[in-house]
């Protein structure tokens, strides 16, 4: 998104706000389309194997993105962004469902908090690194190399994930993404505590995404700043999320 905001907008002759929102939409769209299907796959197959498979696909996607960066093929970068959104959609249920299998009930809240904190800090580190790379000579080459390197490191790390038994190996997967999504929503609605918890969580991310998507343009057009201003504002959000995650165990008293 930083590349689209500070480099691609002028070359493509498009408004920064349009590019920002288009990029955000392409990344989020797979969550709406494939989340229910991803949950079924996470229940049917062993999670460490699935993680390694997804991380291999991530390397392929990052190679595609690197090609788009180096040759400045911006439509290809949009395709890679959609594919990374799809990657995150299928990886999400795996990583969040792994903890209940690996942790006891008393450990779960704290583990979830640490998990979310780690995610926030990783995002923060990535944003800071992106800002540094954008200031270097030939930034697109650096970005290409770093993204592929990080994807490879992610795959290597996935090889150390302990094997866990698949919860529902006999599950028959319904590949109709619209039917499965509707059925999932209907089932959640019958469980008020789950329904309202998910609504609250979804509202938080909806509210955050609405504002965070506008940060690059706000920094560039209103504050007249560069990438460092964007990173500072996004850092505040990430740090807040990380601190809140740490407080989860204390606030909930493991309930």
Regions from the PLM with identified roles:
Residues 2-14, 66-71, 123-147, 221-222, ...:
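Transmembrane alpha-helix termini and helix-breaking/packing motifs in multi-pass membrane transporters
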Residues 97, 101-102, 144-173, 254:
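Helix-loop junctions on the cytosolic side of multi-pass membrane transporters
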Residues 1-29, 190-237:
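Helix-loop boundary and gating motifs at the non-cytosolic
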Residues 61, 74-90, 202-203:
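Hydrophobic core of transmembrane alpha-helices in multi-pass small-molecule transporters
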């Amino acid at each position: 998104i930083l590349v689209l905001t500070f480099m691609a907008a002028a070359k493509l002759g498009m408004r920064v706000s349009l590019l920002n929102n288009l990029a955000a939409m392409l990344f989020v769209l797979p969550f709406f389309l494939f989340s229910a299907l991803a949950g079924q796959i996470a229940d049917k197959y062993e999670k460490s194997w699935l993680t390694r498979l997804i991380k291999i696909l991530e390397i392929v996607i990052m190679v595609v993105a690197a090609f788009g960066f180096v040759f400045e093929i911006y439509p290809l970068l949009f395709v890679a962004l959609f594919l990374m959104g799809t990657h995150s959609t299928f990886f999400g249920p795996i990583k969040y469902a792994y903890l209940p299998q690996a942790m006891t009930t008393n450990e779960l809240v704290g583990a979830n908090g640490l998990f979310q904190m780690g995610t926030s800090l990783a995002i923060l580190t990535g944003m800071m690194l992106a800002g540094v790379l954008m200031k270097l000579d030939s930034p697109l080459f650096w970005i290409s190399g770093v993204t592929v390197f990080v994807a490879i490191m992610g795959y290597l790390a996935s090889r150390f994930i302990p094997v866990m038994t698949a919860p529902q190996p006999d599950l028959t997967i319904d590949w109709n993404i619209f039917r499965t999504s509707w059925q999932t929503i209907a089932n959640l609605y019958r469980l008020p505590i789950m329904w309202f918890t998910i609504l609250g969580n979804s509202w938080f991310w909806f509210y955050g995404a609405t504002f965070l998507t506008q940060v690059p343009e706000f920094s560039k057009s209103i504050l007249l700043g560069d990438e460092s201003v964007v990173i500072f504002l996004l850092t505040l959000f990430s740090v807040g999320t990380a601190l809140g995650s740490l407080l989860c165990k204390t606030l909930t008293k493991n309930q």
